[in-house]
């Protein structure tokens, strides 16, 4: 929800900072790596029970996550490779943060509550996969109640007010499940209505090319056999 409505606005507002970092010699990949390192530190701190410090590190983790795109645009190095690295780092950051929460619960809350952040992580990965797969099919799966920005904000509230952490995790789980259903339904409708999508046209073109190549190979084979059969 916030990713779709505000991400482009935030990116544009951070372009001047991205230019300054580029002039200082900072690359977008370096910013992304810093974000991963900070997420790993936050994971350890949360796992050890320092939730307020974990909250601070979680907030700081959002800084490089917001800046890597503007730095890439300012330096003119925005590329599929960078987009891939950024997407992978986002999933890794999610796993580190929720893994830290699971570690904390394993040591302080006996029972099955440790599975709560694990379930949230599974749903967050499913939500991300839905978008990636939909985009590979030239469909749109953006949107939903609990996108990545919302997960960051709600988890930060849970770390800041530790007595409400379990309630916050349940809220994240429910909203993530709703988001997964929303995205599934959205893509399902598009796939049902759009009979001639760019993906389908490319797939048809690939099939046509395969048929043409097989026909060419057969023609070459027939021509070669005719040459071999000629009397010398």
Task: Name each region found by the language model.
Residues 2-18, 87-232:
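A feature for the membrane-embedded catalytic helix bundles of lipid/isoprenoid biosynthetic enzymes
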């Amino acid at each position: 929800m916030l990713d779709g409505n505000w991400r482009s606005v935030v990116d544009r507002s951070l372009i001047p900072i991205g230019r300054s970092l580029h002039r200082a010699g900072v690359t977008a990949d370096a910013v992304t790596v810093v974000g991963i390192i900070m997420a790993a530190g936050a994971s350890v701190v949360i796992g050890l029970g320092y939730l307020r410090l974990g909250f601070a590190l979680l907030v700081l983790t959002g800084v490089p996550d917001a800046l890597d795109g503007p730095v890439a645009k300012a330096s003119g190095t925005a590329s599929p490779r960078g987009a891939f690295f950024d997407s992978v780092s986002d999933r890794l950051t999610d796993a580190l943060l929720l893994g830290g929460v699971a570690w904390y619960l394993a040591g302080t809350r006996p029972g099955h509550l440790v599975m709560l952040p694990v379930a949230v992580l599974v749903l967050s990965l499913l939500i991300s996969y839905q978008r990636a797969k939909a985009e590979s099919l030239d469909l749109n799966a953006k949107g939903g109640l609990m996108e990545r920005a919302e997960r960051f904000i709600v988890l930060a509230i849970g770390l800041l007010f530790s007595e409400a952490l379990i309630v916050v995790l349940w809220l994240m789980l429910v909203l993530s499940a709703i988001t997964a259903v929303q995205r599934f339904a959205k893509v399902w409708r598009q796939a049902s209505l759009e009979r001639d999508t760019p993906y389908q046209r490319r797939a048809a073109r690939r099939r046509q090319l395969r048929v043409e190549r097989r026909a060419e190979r057969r023609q070459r084979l027939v021509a070669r056999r005719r040459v071999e059969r000629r009397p010398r």
